[in-house]
Every structure is written in structure tokens, then in C-alpha cells.
Regions:
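All-alpha prenyltransferase/terpene-synthase fold signal
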Residues: 1-177
Length: 177
């Protein structure tokens, strides 16, 4: 999946890429733990799906924080994905939802080889805000988080045994770093 040289990446392609890159690692760890712990196949599968969904939410949260996070809390410079033209959920949806004028400006910034870092980050962030990418990303993060909770709820153990995983997922979604 070579996205870095394309401006026409579909959201579904990106979600599949981050599922394979990030989500399955967490999902597999949860499923292996479930199997080793003697869980039923159904519970192991539900824990896998829980991990997959929370992994998607986590990666989208990472994309979001790279644009809207607080540098002091995030631990790295904001806008790194913007300056490197990384195809994130944010940029992909900006291209897919922009009007002609906004798209042309995005293309100019993505194709620019010389630029002032702060100016590029500010301009692309402004475009994201105009297009509504900030709200779109937050809605998608919440969607995957809600889906993860559905799968965790299906695991057939007492709620108190799932509480730690639920709390961990909640902390992941409220993180600012």
C-alpha cells in the first residue's frame, strides 16, 4: 500500500493499512492472552475484535494529536505529519472532502519542496478546520472506541474481570500524548 505518492487514497484504504500496521498487533496480543488463559474461541475472537477496534481508534487519535495536540504534553513537535506529507486520516479526508480551491492549496503545500515549517503547519491546519476534518476525526475515533466497547461487552466473563481492559481503553482514548 504505497500511499505516499498518491493524493487519491480512499479512507477505507487508509483504515485497512492502519488495521494491518497497528491494530492487529494489539488484537493478536489480546487473543493470544485469551487463548493461553483458557478463554472460549468466541471470547478470544471478541477480544481480538476489541483490540482491533481500539487499535484503529488509537492510530486515528495519534493522527489527530499530531495536528491538534499540545507540544508540551504530546512530547514531540506538532505538525510532523503535515511537514512530511504523511498520508494520515486527516490529510486523506482533506483531499477527499475539499472543494477545488482547498484541494489546489493542499496540493501546493504537499508538492512544495521549500517552505517555512510553521507556515505550512498553520496553512494545512486552517484547511483541515475549514473542511471540518477535526470534527470528522473525532467522530471516527469515537466510532471505533464505541465498537471496541461492544466487543468487550460480548466477552462472557464477569464485568469486574473486564474492568481493567475497559479502563485501559478509556485511558488510551483520553490521552493527550
Amino acid at each position: 500500500m504505497d500511499f505516499e505518492h498518491r493524493n487519491d487514497v480512499a479512507e477505507e484504504e487508509y483504515i485497512e493499512m492502519i488495521r494491518l500496521k497497528t491494530s492487529v498487533l494489539l488484537a493478536c496480543a489480546l487473543k493470544i492472552g485469551a487463548v493461553l488463559g483458557g478463554a472460549s474461541a468466541e471470547d478470544a475472537d471478541n477480544l481480538y475484535r476489541f483490540g482491533e477496534q481500539i487499535g484503529l481508534a488509537f492510530q486515528l487519535q495519534d493522527d489527530y494529536l499530531d495536528v491538534y495536540g499540545d507540544t508540551k504534553v504530546f512530547g514531540k513537535a506538532i505538525g510532523g505529519d503535515i511537514t512530511s506529507n504523511k498520508k494520515t486520516y486527516m490529510l486523506i479526508n482533506a483531499f477527499n472532502r475539499a472543494n477545488d480551491e482547498q484541494r489546489a492549496e493542499l496540493v501546493r503545500w504537499v508538492e512544495a519542496t521549500e517552505f517555512d515549517r510553521a507556515e505550512k503547519v498553520a496553512a494545512v491546519t486552517r484547511l483541515y478546520n475549514e473542511i471540518g476534518i477535526d470534527r470528522l476525526a473525532q467522530q471516527k475515533i469515537e466510532y471505533f472506541f464505541a465498537e471496541s466497547r461492544k466487543y468487550l461487552a460480548k466477552v462472557s466473563v464477569a464485568e469486574e474481570r473486564k474492568a481493567e481492559l475497559a479502563a485501559y481503553a478509556e485511558r488510551m482514548m483520553k490521552r493527550k500524548y
